[in-house]
Design a protein with these regions (language model features):
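Serine/threonine-biased, Pro/acidic-interspersed low-complexity stretches characteristic
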Residues: 32-35, 457-460, 464-523, 527-646
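Catalytic cores of nucleotide-sugar-dependent glycosyltransferases that transfer UDP/GDP/TDP-activated
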Residues: 1-471
Length: 646
């Protein structure tokens, strides 16, 4: 199987974030099972001599919007580099706020496909990543008509490649593509959206993030198009390259250790404390390594530091980012004897910090995958995380249920400073129980987050696509036939983390409040607290939310934002109490409430031959087959209540 892996950055040649790490490690792991080549732009910042990058001698030309471009192909090992001769990639920064970024990366996408044409190669799989290479999916399907299957990976949905609609002509595209179902986005073009639409399969970097991006909270205004294409979405947790990140091998350390011999970890910690002018090797060391942005939970850390500075702990912070955060951290330097702050990034220092640390702070507001928590666990540190995205998929609270594919850490239920402080005190208390703490540390060091395992999920997907399998668009099982003569809002659980809601709204109700449909907002509530919301564009429709609702009261409301910015409800759903997640015994049991009013309106067409869990006021939950449910409907029997559920 031949694979072409396309990325705008690949470590160690160029890296701005996690994409660079994945673009290095994943092809390396897949090399054991396939013929894979990686390809990226040849930036000005890349040291050609250091990395032994040599010209292949291949030069080719092509036209885009009546402009001729000339590319030369360079190579280092299994990585190809495309050099555009007019200087599109000879800028001081890889990305930057350049006014022609649409041209820079759009032409790069053309250049990749023209390379395939010039060399007359066939690739079974084209694996493209993030918005910079996203246009390849459209070009493959609409212009080049290649038989290769296209897999698109979203590493961070927040970066979408949004440009003026003038880019349609600048990139030599047809205006036929400028529709809401293709690449149009608020009268602009959205390159990331184009790959969601045109790829054969699109993936994200963790299973939880794949669910989150279908919600208003995490969907970055693309949740609807993602929901529409959910049938071809797969979440695969990133892995770690243990040849690169391993305390028993790391060349950045002057001493080494592993799970069976932790002695040198203390010695490395003592050296680091001396280097950073901190005292107390027996105190727990809490660290943060990363970008200073709101997404990373920096506000939560900053608001907590003055309180934590009086605690018997040491704190080390390494990173840089937004100017306001850089300034705030700079003002804290030297104020507390147990706090060390280094603004900037030094990979060797980062490795020494990982190896010295006892706890890693990672209070991200959202985190598509995250690698730091996996690296930290390998280096004998316990992560303190928000349970979002890949953090939720890789870290479980040590006080919670055991999971053999997750490390053990401490989870933060929200983003306020007191929660962060309490978690730190909880960690301190655990640290004092040396036996228990060391048991957790050794367990974490042995959890396998390697790419050797994770790459097999990609390999399986690629193999299926090569052999002709394609995901099929299906009508969601629980969609209900539409009627326009009533006002109704139904809510029911599909599984412990999936909430289905269906609505019908009459023109009369809209006229009563002098509203149009596009002013309406759907909100989901768990135990009376709003957990998610979405804009509504149809009088009849349905929507899926993904809250945690085990044993909690769940409902939805439809309304609008009033003159003073408050939400005004015009339609409220039934309220149900979600069952215990543990009732699920197999995939053949659907975790779902059949609500009274739904039965009374005799909308049974969405029921299949699977089982449903139903409860009445006289007995505990019972399993009923479809025929029995149909009999209940026919006999107009009632069970439950209009405000209750299972």
């Amino acid at each position: 199987m031949k694979i072409l892996f396309v990325s705008s950055e690949i470590f160690p040649f160029a890296k701005s974030g996690g994409l660079g790490d994945v673009a290095s490690s994943l092809p390396k792991a897949l090399k054991n099972y396939s013929d894979i080549t990686s390809i990226m732009p040849l930036y000005k910042s890349i040291d050609r001599e250091k990395h032994n990058i040599q010209s292949t001698g291949l030069v080719y030309e092509f036209w885009v919007n009546l402009i001729q471009y000339q590319f030369e192909v360079f190579q280092s090992g299994d990585v190809l580099f495309l050099d555009e001769k007019s200087g599109l990639f000879q800028r001081d920064e890889m990305y930057g706020e350049y006014g022609d970024n649409d041209i820079r990366f759009g032409v790069f996408c053309y250049g990749v496909l023209e390379y395939i044409r010039a060399t007359e190669q066939y690739f079974d799989i084209l694996h493209i990543n993030d918005w910079q290479s996203a246009l390849i999916a459209l070009l493959v399907k609409e212009k080049y008509k290649l038989d290769s299957k296209v897999v698109f990976t979203i590493h961070n949905l927040a970066y979408q490649g949004i440009f003026s609609k003038k880019s349609i002509e600048r990139l030599d595209l047809s205006w036929d593509y400028f529709t809401a179902s293709k690449i149009e986005y608020h009268d602009q073009i959205n390159l990331l959206k184009s790959a969601i639409v045109y790829s054969d399969v699109f993936t994200t970097v963790s299973p939880t993030y794949a669910k989150e991006i279908q919600t208003h909270q995490f969907g970055c205004d693309l949740e609807q198009i993602i929901q529409d294409n959910e049938y071809k979405l797969k979440g695969i947790l990133n892995g770690v390259d243990y040849e690169e990140f391993n305390p028993s091998l790391d060349a950045n350390l002057n001493k080494h250790f592993d799970a069976d011999n932790l002695g040198n970890k203390r010695a490395i910690k003592e050296d680091l404390l001396n280097e950073l002018h901190l005292e107390g090797v027996d105190k727990p060391l809490f660290v943060f390594i990363g970008r200073f942005t709101g997404q990373k939970g920096i506000d939560q850390i900053l608001e907590s530091l003055n309180t934590l500075a009086s605690s018997p702990i040491n704190i080390v912070i390494l990173g840089s980012g937004e100017k306001r955060y850089n300034d705030w951290f700079h003002a804290l330097i030297g104020l507390h004897k147990n706090l060390s702050i280094t603004i900037g990034y030094d990979e060797a220092l980062a490795r020494r910090i990982y190896a010295s640390s006892d706890f890693l702070y990672m209070p991200s507001q959202y985190e598509p995958c995250g690698l730091n928590q996996m690296i930290a666990m390998k280096y004998g540190a316990m992560p303190i995380v928000r349970p979002v995205g890949g953090l939720k998929d890789s870290v479980a609270d040590f006080d919670g249920e055991f999971s053999d594919n997750k490390g053990r850490g401490i989870t933060l239920e929200n983003g306020n400073a007191q929660t962060f402080i309490n978690a730190t005190y909880k960690a301190l208390h655990l640290y004092l129980d040396k036996s228990k703490f060391n048991e957790i540390i050794q367990y974490n060091m042995n959890v396998d987050f390697s790419w050797d395992e994770k790459s097999k999920e990609y390999l399986s997907l690629f193999t299926d696509l090569k052999e002709g399998w394609l995901p099929e668009r299906t009508i969601k099982k629980f969609e209900i036939p539409s009627y326009y003569n009533i006002n109704t809002l139904k809510t029911m659980p599909v599984d412990p983390n999936t909430l289905y809601t269906y609505w019908e709204i009459t023109t009369r109700l809209l006229n009563t409040h002098q509203l149009s449909v596009n002013q309406l907002i759907l909100k989901a509530y768990v135990d009376g607290i709003e957990v998610d919301s979405a804009n509504i564009y149809d009088r009849v429709g349905n929507y899926y939310f993904y809250p945690e609702m085990d044993f909690k009261k769940v409902s939805t409301k439809i309304g609008f934002i009033g003159a003073y910015g408050t939400f005004i409800s015009i339609l409220e759903s039934n309220v149900f109490v979600a069952p215990n997640a543990k009732v699920i015994k197999s995939d053949n049991i659907i975790w779902r409430n059949i609500e009274t009013d739904t039965l009374n309106t005799k909308r049974a067409s969405f029921m299949s031959d699977t089982y449903y869990e139903v409860s009445d006021s006289l007995s505990s939950a019972s399993i009923l087959k479809r025929k029995e449910l149909q009999k209940i409907i026919k006999d107009n029997q009632r069970f439950g209540s209009s405000k209750g559920g299972i």
